[in-house]
Amino acid sequence: MKQSNSRWAVNLTALVLAAGLLIGLFTGCFQLGSSKPQTGNSQPQPNEYGHLKTDGYGTITGYTCAQTDLPKVLVIPAKIGEEVITGIGWSAFKDCTSLTELKLPASLTKIGSSAFSDCTGLTSIDLSACINLTEIGYNAFSGCTGLTSIDLSACTSLTQIGNSAFSSCTGLTSIDLSGCTSITKIEKYAFYGCRGLTEVKLPASLTGIGELAFHGCTSLTSIDLSACTSLTQIGGRAFFKCDGLTEVKLPASLTEIGHGAFKGCTGLTSLDLSACTSLTAISGFSGCTSLTEVKLPASLTQIDGNAFFKCESLTEVKLPASLTQIGGSAFFKCEGLTEVKLPASLTKISQGAFEGCTGLTSAVFADKNDWKVYNNYDYSDIPTDIQLNNTATAAWYLREAYADKYWKKN
């Protein structure tokens, strides 16, 4: 009987121990998935709220459900538990093609890189409450082809729209940044390939537009930057191949138009830069095949290479008295140009500047003396003296006879 009781006691003890172990294991699993930070742990823990997941520091990092189970209308809350939501993390909702609408909270300060990129079903973003938003990261909404408009006018704290932030949003028709008075630069590729874009409102605070920022925005018909009184720079190819563009208004503050900035804008018919009194060099209008008239500022000292390359409809350009240099191929194949008047200040004309200008019949040099042509760009070879008294002969020299030479006034 004693042996039986002893055996029973051992079995009971084993059963109690096993039960305790199972309870401990179960409790541990529950705590691992808990949405609350554990007692005694000073570090914030990852937080889950419905389908949203955070890093414990206020940034949503993604979702816990299957992508297809995400709500089509996604409302990001200002708080999850006690955690204030201030950011959307890197690639948090990338490729979530089922999303159609997005509403973001007032607490938000940052939208991370690629946060909503390639959400092709997204048609609407409500940023009306986002008064604290300071940054939209690299590629944040790139490839959101269903998006038709973006109103950032309420985002008065916004200081940065990152590289490629809205690139390839081919359905986008309008963008309003007029209220974003803390933005100083549109970064490169920001609206690259937004071929449906017809209207852009930019803030007066703008100082620069990055390279390729609006490249390929083929539906854009006008760009008015005249109110951007602090704008100094338009980057290379910023409006390249915006072939629907017919009107451009630029401010007096502008000091630089980058190489190819308006290249291939085949709809542009006239260009008035006369008010750009801080501009000393010009480039960027090559391939503007419909351009007929150009007005240059009195401050201009240099026309860069390829500046008006193959602007074949150009019939009139008045060169300012301050001009000292004309770059290589600057007016190459401007076949509509019939006369050019070259100021006394001019000292250098580079190779091919007027080559192929088949309509050019008159070249009037204000100072006809001491002009020589060289074979080398560094003027190191023995030069040829030329006479420029006859305007027709001078035109022939420019377009054909000495078109491939480097001209210099000694």
Regions found by a protein language model. Give the residues of each.
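Structural signature of tandem-repeat unit edges
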Residues: 9-12, 48-58, 69-87, 97-110, ...
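Hydrophobic core
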Residues: 17, 21-25
